[in-house]
Design a protein with these regions (language model features):
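Short, cationic low-complexity segments
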Residues: 39-62, 112-116
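Acidic/polar-rich alpha-helix caps and helix-coil junctions
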Residues: 1-37, 68-70, 75-230
Length: 230
C-alpha cells in the first residue's frame, strides 16, 4: 500500500516502481507545469470536479459496495467518506486535508469558489499554496504506469472469457490491496453490482468485467482516460 500514495503524483522524480513514462519537470530548465493553478483557480481552468454518482463507486475498506449501505443516498459528506477505499482520500479534499501557507499547515476543506460539487480534486496538487498562482509546479506527471498495465491485462482476459481467480488476485486484488481494501482480494466476484449496471454499464452482466471497469475509473481518475473508457 506504500506505493499508492499521493507521492506518486506529486513527486519531483517519477516513482520508478510504478511509473513507466512521465512528463518530468525541471526548475533548472524552466520546465514546470500548472497543476495547482488548474485545480485551484476559480477562473483559470474548467473547475473540474467529481460528481456523487462517481464517488459512490468507491468501495468500503472491507471491499463491499458503498451503495449497499442503508441511507447512502442522503449521507452527509463527513459520513459518506468514512472507511472508504483510500484512493478517495488521495483524490479529493477531505476532513484531514491540510495545505501549507507561509510554512504553516492549515486545514483546507473544499473551496466553493472552485468546486461545484464539494468533491475538490487534489491528485496533482502540491500542498504549498505558493504553487497556486501560475505554472510553478515541479512535480512529474505520470503518463503510463504499472496500474494501467494490470488493468489492461485484466480487462483483455475478462473480455476473452478466460479471466481466473489467479488473474484477479494479481491484478484487481493487488490494486485494491495497496489502496487499503481488505476484502475480496483473492477471488472474482460472483454477483453483478446493480448500481454500476444502472448508472454506467447497463450492457455488462459479467461481475468480473463490471468490477474491472469500476477499478479503471477509480485507479485512473483524472488521468485522461475516462472518456474513452466510457
Amino acid at each position: 500500500s506504500d506505493v499508492y500514495k499521493r507521492q506518486l503524483f506529486i513527486s519531483v522524480k517519477p516513482v520508478t516502481t510504478e511509473v513507466m513514462l512521465a512528463a518530468v519537470c525541471d526548475k533548472s530548465l524552466s520546465v514546470l507545469n500548472d497543476a495547482n493553478w488548474y485545480w485551484t483557480s476559480a477562473t483559470y481552468g474548467p473547475r473540474l470536479n467529481l460528481i456523487r454518482t462517481f464517488v459512490n463507486t468507491y468501495l468500503m475498506e472491507d471491499g463491499t459496495p458503498f451503495t449497499d449501505k442503508e441511507g447512502y443516498k442522503t449521507m452527509v459528506f463527513m459520513d459518506e467518506v468514512k472507511n472508504r477505499d483510500k484512493r478517495l482520500q488521495q483524490t479529493i479534499r477531505m476532513g484531514d486535508y491540510k495545505r501549507i501557507d507561509g510554512g504553516v499547515q492549515t486545514p483546507a476543506p473544499p473551496i466553493f469558489s472552485y468546486t461545484y460539487t464539494g468533491y475538490q480534486p487534489i491528485k496533482y496538487c502540491l500542498d504549498d499554496v505558493f504553487y497556486d498562482s501560475g505554472a510553478n509546479n515541479d512535480n512529474s506527471i505520470p503518463l503510463i504506469r504499472f496500474a494501467e498495465v494490470l488493468l489492461n491485462y485484466a480487462e483483455a482476459k475478462a473480455e476473452l472469457g478466460v479471466f481466473t481467480d489467479a488473474d484477479w488476485e494479481k491484478t484487481i486484488g493487488a490494486l485494491r490491496g495497496r489502496a487499503g481494501i481488505t476484502g475480496g482480494l483473492t477471488a472474482r466476484p460472483t454477483k453483478a453490482d446493480p448500481y454500476l449496471q444502472a448508472n454506467y454499464f447497463p450492457e455488462i452482466t459479467d461481475p468480473s468485467l463490471l468490477e474491472i471497469r469500476r477499478e479503471r475509473g477509480i485507479e485512473l481518475v483524472f488521468e485522461g482516460l475516462r472518456f474513452s473508457d466510457l
